Amino acid sequence: MSSLKDEVPTETSEDFGFKFLGQKQILPSFNEKLPFASLQNLDISNSKSLFVAASGSKAVVGELQLLRDHITSDSTPLTFKWEKEIPDVIFVCFHGDQVLVSTRNALYSLDLEELSEFRTVTSFEKPVFQLKNVNNTLVILNSVNDLSALDLRTKSTKQLAQNVTSFDVTNSQLAVLLKDRSFQSFAWRNGEMEKQFEFSLPSELEELPVEEYSPLSVTILSPQDFLAVFGNVISETDDEVSYDQKMYIIKHIDGSASFQETFDITPPFGQIVRFPYMYKVTLSGLIEPDANVNVLASSCSSEVSIWDSKQVIEPSQDSERAVLPISEETDKDTNPIGVAVDVVTSGTILEPCSGVDTIERLPLVYILNNEGSLQIVGLFHVAAIKSGHYSINLESLEHEKSLSPTSEKIPIAGQEQEEKKKNNESSKALSENPFTSANTSGFTFLKTQPAAANSLQSQSSSTFGAPSFGSSAFKIDLPSVSSTSTGVASSEQDATDPASAKPVFGKPAFGAIAKEPSTSEYAFGKPSFGAPSFGSGKSSVESPASGSAFGKPSFGTPSFGSGNSSVEPPASGSAFGKPSFGTPSFGSGNSSAEPPASGSAFGKPSFGTSAFGTASSNETNSGSIFGKAAFGSSSFAPANNELFGSNFTISKPTVDSPKEVDSTSPFPSSGDQSEDESKSDVDSSSTPFGTKPNTSTKPKTNAFDFGSSSFGSGFSKALESVGSDTTFKFGTQASPFSSQLGNKSPFSSFTKDDTENGSLSKGSTSEINDDNEEHESNGPNVSGNDLTDSTVEQTSSTRLPETPSDEDGEVVEEEAQKSPIGKLTETIKKSANIDMAGLKNPVFGNHVKAKSESPFSAFATNITKPSSTTPAFSFGNSTMNKSNTSTVSPMEEADTKETSEKGPITLKSVENPFLPAKEERTGESSKKDHNDDPKDGYVSGSEISVRTSESAFDTTANEEIPKSQDVNNHEKSETDPKYSQHAVVDHDNKSKEMNETSKNNERSGQPNHGVQGDGIALKKDNEKENFDSNMAIKQFEDHQSSEEDASEKDSRQSSEVKESDDNMSLNSDRDESISESYDKLEDINTDELPHGGEAFKAREVSASADFDVQTSLEDNYAESGIQTDLSESSKENEVQTDAIPVKHNSTQTVKKEAVDNGLQTEPVETCNFSVQTFEGDENYLAEQCKPKQLKEYYTSAKVSNIPFVSQNSTLRLIESTFQTVEAEFTVLMENIRNMDTFFTDQSSIPLVKRTVRSINNLYTWRIPEAEILLNIQNNIKCEQMQITNANIQDLKEKVTDYVRKDIAQITEDVANAKEEYLFLMHFDDASSGYVKDLSTHQFRMQKTLRQKLFDVSAKINHTEELLNILKLFTVKNKRLDDNPLVAKLAKESLARDGLLKEIKLLREQVSRLQLEEKGKKASSFDASSSITKDMKGFKVVEVGLAMNTKKQIGDFFKNLNMAK
């Protein structure tokens, strides 16, 4: 309830007054072109004794005492601590240790400790009119009258109210004046608002027109007292200004508001265009303990007023009033642009008031005007000063300024605002680190470490020692006791931390501090070529007290990961031999204490285990940078730390027994593995990149541990490990190259375990995959897209760059001869869909119970002989019918077979590539071992060669490939496994047959390792083979040169033709007769994929898959097929193994050393930042899990360059038909697999929660999410419909008002115009032979004109009569002075004149009566007849009177003459 009361009393006080201390110009003038906003360009920090001011285009910060001395005296010069050219500043204030400076469009901050750091905090969407700073919150009123609050700590904006004209805020209260002239008051607590009360204008003031008295400003004088200003609206474009304002003191008591008008507070007589704003300085307890004294100034006035909570105070003396000066340039009043109070500076004030000689302290009011001039006046109260009760409360003053006491810096624009999340996460357990927890990380596949793992290394280590924006920037020295972290910088940080270890922006990014004793770890470790940079901290008892941000010099100890804490340095721990600039670059570290639980350079490792190596225990043997070897041995580090040096040695790997250690997959689950599996415990020393292998009785698992290794070269172990008879299975989640039972492949989670279907893993990249890649794709813990943004340099999806494989992929030929008749028979049987198990062909299987006579029966006995030289690698054996086998697992064999043995190798029966998978498995189920699946198939083509090199040492392949290529290769791996199985079988059959003669061929000096194009022979890593290391080196060099030659070829087809011609010329006729086309089917299968050659490039509508099958007899592989040596010297037909070194040729390259240096120096943190920054971000996750595109659909297959085996034309037609049909089947399988992959991906839902945040990226949505998308769209439509309806309603109201006012008037005018137009048309009608009657309007006009004419005629006649009388008087004066008759006539004439008037009046009345009677009697009449008659009669009477008068005069003169 509001009421209007009497005027506020104004007291002329003898006590209150202002003491003028001085005035000087300190800043440039605005020149009357002030920003149209509430200028608050002066602020004083009494606690810091500093001031900030802005005027013109300059902002300054300086010492307050120096400013006062400069103003009050002429001797002290003024210097500033900081100054900057900033145009159109509208707001400055102190905020803790910073200064806020704002224009209408942006907010800036200045660090008082680092005055050079002037940065942009945020930019405003709409121009700003008014700002207030309170409790770390900036309250903003913009040009569209929206009131919002900007949190200076989080930069988040929250809208408070709309249609706001003005507001004022204190620490606990927010007052708002709305455009409808209503008031609202809110309680302000911790940034949250709660409405206290609201009221509107009294009914008496409601009558004031809004156009003239619009709401302008509201000011809080006390919690219950307000000052409101109403007046005319001023525009920024106005040239001349005149203010007409009404001010009211509002007191709100017990739910009712009383309005009292005042005329003496800052009377608005300003002459400069200003945005209306009221400045105030509140002094609490200055005179009375509970009363406020408010010093008020207005942007529209040059006077300063005092309000003492009860009345307006005016000093009695004019000299004691505070008035701004008149401009010397324009002779106009100046007005304030900033007002502040100073209560801390010192200086004696002489004669402040009457009766007081000097005083040391007064509240000094600093007033900055629009010309940059600063005036200082001191507020005094004579009685209080004399009585000693004049109290200046500094604490209440600072509290009233609403400045934040915290020294926390404001986040600047462009910084990642991760601190919002970190404040909550910092107090959580370490397992909730976004890079350690399986539930919170973007890599949801991460496994948790054992809860009881005893580690000396912190589990909360971030990816690079610490997160990007948070706790230690480059290094974290974690305290040795349990501690927690808060949202601000911890005061308990070690005093010896280096500068770089301090928080970058005051807070830890992820806020986790280890709860276990931990040692310091470097964020970026030691330098690029120096001490450990990534991860493994020193595990010795004594941690470094302080460390450099980048550790020791650039050329020192290992760069990526290992730290040495033992007394002795490591024997050999090079990642790539010896590093380029010092000690091992990537290698492992040594620890004299227990192994760390997760001593990752990345905190907890990015993929579940340590990122770049942990310290091993007890011994200091060398280890791989990536843990164990890619295929059972250490990855890259040779025994003597020289990979390519003269001391290159090959040591034999050891196969550790399984110790019930479960190495987790470093990649996310595909969804098939249960969460329990994803959380399974791993060994405390598991690490994806750099474990000290086999230094204790308990082996340490590795996420990239493809086999166990004690030390030595990664290649040597891989080469020597092939001699073992241990086998592997396709489709299992255990790595085929791991020597430990529980060691799962890091890439085993690409696909589901399809062992029941007998197919290869769904993640296989092409038709033929090497064993490593096959098992990399079997793990259930990863999805394809998660591999491309790894924080460990994309080691998850390892692919070498596919060099121009579209053109250079060449066919690998078999080494020895094989009967063309036998191969033709085999092909015909396959084409006829004959069950191979039913044929019992001993050449292709081990089914010894049923042997039938065949041209190949001579080789049956040698097939099943035990051999220690098993082929290096095979894809022929898949996971089909694993359940029907019962051979011991490869891990069990690893315990019992430390060296290569001659035990029997049970080969699988033939898998017919042309039969359905079920038929093949039916014929082979009885011949397969559960884990013994050695196959000697080979892979041809550039793509398969690339894969071989990748799989051989998968952990380093990514060092050479572009990330885009890695993504493409991985996307290809999401295809159906059946096609891979289909492509492998044929080569497997041939490899078995060739194995019988390969050994004899080797003894006879025949070459058994050839490389055609990029084709490489593959070998299983967990099979062992003894061979010469020097031969491996030599073959590595040969292969390196052959790869360079192959990359220079222009096209694949031309190179194949050329090599085919050369091979035909070099080899014997017998070799030419043995080369059969069916051995090259693997080329068809290999090259049919989009990245495997020219085949299947459906770039046009009628695209076809081009199969280039070419035979080259110069370079052969033992694995390309089963060879038969018909010579007599071939007494023992065994499987050839000399092609093994080829497998390593693609990985043993000199480039590794350069890549090592590159990895040491590249800013790897960028990749890590993307993970830390976008952790949990829906858009980021949607991008990572975006749906796969539907691959190209091939319409046909094109087979060219078929190498015919037979010379018979009929057989050649059969061969050509077979090749064509097989190619068409291959194309069909490829299309089916592509569609299956697409449908499977569309059917999955990788993101549990989808909101409107990711609706802009529609390509990341899948079909099952359509309902969610529809709901979101419906919700948006509902919101938009509400807005639209409101707009429509508003428009209807405007239209109604327009119709009611404007349209009604227009309608009336149109009706009148239409009436007149119709009348004119009728009047203008030529057919009318008579004059039309006048309309009513015309008749009125006619009547009016006639009446006026009548009046004019009457006046003329009267004038004539008077002239005649004048003439008579003239005659009388001249001649008739003595004649009494003339005088008598003159008098009588005057009397007759009155009579004439009466006669005229009577006639008019009679005429009117006649007109009325005629109007009643006749419908139409001649309106002018009566008037005409009247006028004629009037003229007759006039003439008669004139004649009579003349006659009388004539008679008079006649008689006079007669008398004479």
UniProtKB/Swiss-Prot annotation:
Residues 1086-1175 are annotated as: Interaction with DYN2. FXFG repeats lie at residues 704-707, 728-731, 873-876. SXFGXPXFG repeats lie at residues 462-470, 503-511, 522-530, 548-556, 574-582, 600-608, 624-632. SXFG repeats lie at residues 610-613, 709-712. One of its GO terms (molecular function) is transcription corepressor activity. InterPro entries: Nup159/Nup146_N (IPR039462), WD40/YVTN_repeat-like_dom_sf (IPR015943). It is a peripheral membrane protein. Pfam families: Beta-prop_NUP159_NUP214. Keywords: Coiled coil, Membrane, mRNA transport, Nuclear pore complex, Nucleus, Phosphoprotein, Protein transport, Repeat, Translocation, Transport. Residues 683-704 have a biased composition (Low complexity). Residues 804-814 have a biased composition (Acidic residues). Contains FG repeats. FG repeats are interaction sites for karyopherins (importins, exportins) and form probably an affinity gradient, guiding the transport proteins unidirectionally with their cargo through the NPC. FG repeat regions are highly flexible and lack ordered secondary structure. The overall conservation of FG repeats regarding exact sequence, spacing, and repeat unit length is limited. FG repeat types and their physico-chemical environment change across the NPC from the nucleoplasmic to the cytoplasmic side: SXFG/PXFG repeats are especially abundant in NUPs on the cytoplasmic side. Functions as a component of the nuclear pore complex (NPC). NPC components, collectively referred to as nucleoporins (NUPs), can play the role of both NPC structural components and of docking or interaction partners for transiently associated nuclear transport factors. Active directional transport is assured by both, a Phe-Gly (FG) repeat affinity gradient for these transport factors across the NPC and a transport cofactor concentration gradient across the nuclear envelope (GSP1 and GSP2 GTPases associated predominantly with GTP in the nucleus, with GDP in the cytoplasm). Present with 1230 molecules/cell in log phase SD medium. This is Nucleoporin NUP159. It comes from Saccharomyces cerevisiae (strain ATCC 204508 / S288c). The lineage of its organism: Eukaryota, Fungi, Dikarya, Ascomycota, Saccharomycotina.
